[in-house]
Amino acid sequence: MAKHLFTSESVSEGHPDKIADQISDAVLDAILEQDPKARVACETYVKTGMVMVGGEVTTSAWVDIEEITRKTVREIGYTHSDMGFDADSCAVLNAIGKQSPDINQGVDRADPKEQGAGDQGLMFGYANNETELLMPAPITYAHALVKRQSEVRKAKTLPWLRPDAKSQVTFAYEDHKIVGIDAIVLSTQHCDSVSQADLIEGVMETIIKPVLPAQWLNKDTKYFINPTGRFVIGGPMGDCGLTGRKIIVDTYGGMARHGGGAFSGKDPSKVDRSAAYAARYVAKNIVAAGLADRCELQVSYAIGVAEPTSISIETFGTGKVSEEALIALVRQHFDLRPYGLTEMLDLARPIYQSTAAYGHFGRNEFPWERTDKAEALRADAKL
């Protein structure tokens, strides 16, 4: 039997890079709410006592960048200067300008269906059948741990928790089937008064055990809870944060390839985001249809051109039909032009802030997680 380990990590909504992602997507949502056809590329930088919001926007909307920023930081939980970051006293700098007309002329068309891609690039979508969500287990449970940390913190179940946290989970596999969890890392920011012993017990009993399936834990599973022994200074006081620096956390935890483009702060005309969502939609429906146990789809674009420049599929030896047949089915059932995929997934609306923490995939509230094409794919594959 072939044995291997695979590790994925996640970070909480209070991690500096995720603060930046959430602010960028909060700005995007506020603009799309007023102007669904807006062009938005919003980048955020956070550091002790300050937030800088920049980028390029073309819109008829007006939004209050400062108020959106403060509200987002407040909801995350940075509300007092003893955390090193306070929503009500931090400086907010606005450096947003207009989108280049050179880009705009390549994207907009008289016929909306011929809308060109907002940039060149390559995107990947992935699905497998090792969880009910058709997502890899390591990233799924890494997200679940930090999401649980946030829930426990906001409920004040463990009142010494602070917003910044990271998780990492190592799964053991035999012949690509999960046989257990080898190691768990959870580091959480905390107030100065809690003892290491109380912290370890609280995290184990209140965060780790309720989240991870008991059948995957055994006497050899290793636990690393705040392994440095102290994590009082965190958030933007500990590290600066930037939009788009957690692209592997945002996607498949490293189990699939990545085209390099970040998601947050980008409207659906940016195929870095919208085509990656569509690629996940395609891959998930292929796996849901039983056409493969694992599926990775790559799609690529040229700026100003509507049709993808390439579509390729890898099923890692698990496909029930040829990859050429799968590509033909994809072309038949999915419109991967920028306008088509925006319509197919109803992307021109304010749904993005909630994507900006705990992963963009494997969450059934999002339209790219539907499996409504699976039955038709299976029928046309004649399985």
Swiss-Prot record:
Catalytic activity reported: L-methionine + ATP + H2O = S-adenosyl-L-methionine + phosphate + diphosphate
Annotated PROSITE patterns: ADOMET_SYNTHASE_1 (PS00376), ADOMET_SYNTHASE_2 (PS00377)
Signal peptide feature range: none
Pfam families attached to this UniProt entry: S-AdoMet_synt_C (PF02773), S-AdoMet_synt_M (PF02772), S-AdoMet_synt_N (PF00438)
GO terms for cellular component: cytoplasm
Residues engaged in binding ATP: 15, 164-166, 230-231, 239, 245-246, 262, 266
Gene3D superfamilies recorded: 3.30.300.10
Bound cofactor: record note: Binds 2 divalent ions per subunit. Binds 1 potassium ion per subunit.
Keywords: ATP-binding, Cytoplasm, Magnesium, Metal-binding, Nucleotide-binding, One-carbon metabolism, Potassium, Transferase
EC number assigned by the record: 2.5.1.6
Requisite cofactors: Mg(2+); K(+)
UniProt-annotated stretches for the region Flexible loop: 99-109
A GO biological-process term: S-adenosylmethionine biosynthetic process
InterPro entries given in the database record: ADOMET_SYNTHASE_CS, S-AdoMet_synt_C, S-AdoMet_synt_central, S-AdoMet_synt_N, S-AdoMet_synthetase, S-AdoMet_synthetase_sfam
Ligand binding (K(+)): 43
Record localization: Cytoplasm
Gene Ontology molecular-function annotations: ATP binding; magnesium ion binding; methionine adenosyltransferase activity
Entry binding sites for Mg(2+): 17
Record-listed L-methionine binding positions: 56, 99, 239, 270
Pathway info: Amino-acid biosynthesis; S-adenosyl-L-methionine biosynthesis; S-adenosyl-L-methionine from L-methionine: step 1/1
Quaternary structure note: Homotetramer; dimer of dimers.
HAMAP family, A to Z: S_AdoMet_synth1 (MF_00086)
Functional description taken from the UniProt entry: Catalyzes the formation of S-adenosylmethionine (AdoMet) from methionine and ATP. The overall synthetic reaction is composed of two sequential steps, AdoMet formation and the subsequent tripolyphosphate hydrolysis which occurs prior to release of AdoMet from the enzyme.
Family: Belongs to the AdoMet synthase family.
Protein name: S-adenosylmethionine synthase
